[in-house]
């Protein structure tokens, strides 16, 4: 092999090489853990619903053991899943009377404490609210701002979308609301 000649090859910054142990540590900052959350609740006659900690005045409420915040429940499940901690029912059973009418912000606080203990943080969240009513776009900024406050993260790292189910099924008949969420976690920097 002593007769081989050396040459320089143009590299790419996106091709991260691992030569030393510190390269692996640096690369781990780019790796994340993902979790998916989903929640669905029925409506009944009432005086409003809560989405992402934001109170929406309307002529119905969400049927639930807690305050029925489907958005926070979905996000909580995605956080718990990504952190390998189980699901919302494991910590906040609907069979336990102490969780009756529970403020869902307390569920998120609990999830954030778990992340802190595991030295993890939320990198970003993406959510989709699925309902016929209320219309989410006129309320989007208020919901985003409340989520930012509750999750202690900038609005720019929270995706909030809404869609209908095209008048199909229980959601399409305006008898229920659902939320699907994806969270990406990473080790704290």
Q: Where are the regions a protein language model picked out?
A:
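Conserved alpha/beta core of the MobA/IspD/sugar-nucleotide pyrophosphorylase nucleotidyltransferase superfamily
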Residues: 1-35
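C-terminal edge-of-domain segments
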Residues: 171-189
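Short acidic capping loops at alpha-helix termini that bridge into adjacent secondary structure
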Residues: 154-157
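Glycine-rich phosphate/pyrophosphate-binding beta-alpha loops
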Residues: 17, 165-166
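Pyridoxal 5′-phosphate
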Residues: 160-164
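Generic structural marker for isolated residues within well-ordered, non-membrane alpha-helices
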Residues: 144
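Glycine-rich, mobile lid/loop segments that gate access to catalytic sites or pores
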Residues: 147
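RNase III-family endoribonuclease catalytic core
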Residues: 22, 29-141, 151
């Amino acid at each position: 092999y002593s007769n081989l000649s050396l040459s320089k090859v143009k590299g790419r910054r996106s091709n991260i090489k691992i030569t030393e142990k510190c390269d692996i540590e640096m690369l781990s900052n780019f790796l994340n853990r993902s979790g998916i959350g989903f929640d669905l609740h029925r409506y009944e006659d009432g005086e409003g619903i809560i989405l992402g900690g934001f109170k929406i005045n309307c002529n119905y409420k969400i049927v639930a053991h807690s305050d029925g915040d489907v958005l926070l429940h979905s996000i909580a499940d995605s956080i718990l899943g990504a952190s390998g901690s189980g699901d919302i029912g494991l910590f906040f059973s609907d069979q336990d009377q102490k969780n009756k009418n529970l403020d869902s912000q307390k569920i998120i606080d609990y999830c954030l404490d778990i992340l802190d203990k595991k030295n993890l943080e939320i990198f970003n969240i993406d959510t989709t609210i699925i309902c016929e009513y209320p219309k989410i776009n006129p309320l989007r900024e208020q919901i985003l701002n409340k989520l930012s406050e509750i999750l202690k993260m900038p609005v720019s790292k929270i995706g909030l979308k809404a869609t209908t189910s095209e008048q199909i099924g229980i959601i399409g008949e305006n008898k229920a609301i659902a939320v699907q969420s994806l969270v990406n976690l990473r080790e704290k920097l």
